[in-house]
Amino acid sequence: MIPVNSPETAVREFFKTFNEGNIEAILAFYEPKAAFVAQPGQVAEGTAALRAAVNGFLSLKPTLTMGPYQLVVAGDIALSVAKWTLQGTGPDGKAVQMEGATTDVLRRQVDGRWLFVIDNPWGVGLLG
């Protein structure tokens, strides 16, 4: 993993790393107590819960593509909003396609890395 010393790099590298399917590398993008919205109304908090939630997506052998995105940075906090599509294969062998607009919060760490604190891939879509 390349150093994620800017929120833009963190977001782009996260998408790339997700497609590689390495759960440990993916989890390295999150703070230990981060929250991940696995589906609307279901929030996974902390590394163990994130591992289970992300593994659910990885079981689809997905390809995750990032569309247009916007970053807003205020000091050590960043808000990222990005469109995404995911294509994979369900347990029944049928094609699966999902799309959404993620709303994420990242925080600069003491060592300069930017990590996800909140990852809500359904964020913008929840507003209707």
Residue ranges and their predicted role:
Residues 1-25, 35-128:
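A beta-strand edge to alpha-helix "cap/lid" segment located at domain peripheries
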